[in-house]
Amino acid sequence: MSKIYVEIENEFGELARYKHHQNGRGFVSATSVVDPTAFVESSAFVEPDAKVGSGAWIGAGSWIDRGAVVGAGVFIGANVHVGQEARIGRGAKIGSHTRIGDRAMIVDGMHIAHDTVVGDDEQIRRSAPRPGRETGFAKAA
């Protein structure tokens, strides 16, 4: 069985190859690893070298950037940006319209409210139940 790829140009003029994920039909880079049990909404993107674990849900319009890791059972709402090389721990829940910064880390089971910004290099070790800017918890080393 052959796979059909789509080439999309990024902001640097580079072409990346994407295929539609079997669950949800979202765009998944040819070099990313997405578990077959994960669900990627049709308007979501998973960029090169990103990983999405089993049973994860990536909402409509969300963007998982290069090298990011989304753990098993994670729920990511609509229109979320997960930054480059960010880590989202198993079972975490990320509300809609949220930005997770580059290299940020959300530990297992955390809940991040909708409309929240987590800064670059931040480590979130407790849930952020209200919308807003979440910084200063513990800088990544």
Kindly label every feature range from the protein language model.
Residues S2-F27, A72, G77-A141:
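Glycine-rich hexapeptide-repeat left-handed beta-helix
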Residues M1-W63:
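Extended, small-residue-rich solenoid/repeat segments and analogous flexible loops
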Residues E47, G53-S54, G59-G61, D65-G73, ...:
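Alpha-helical adaptor scaffolds
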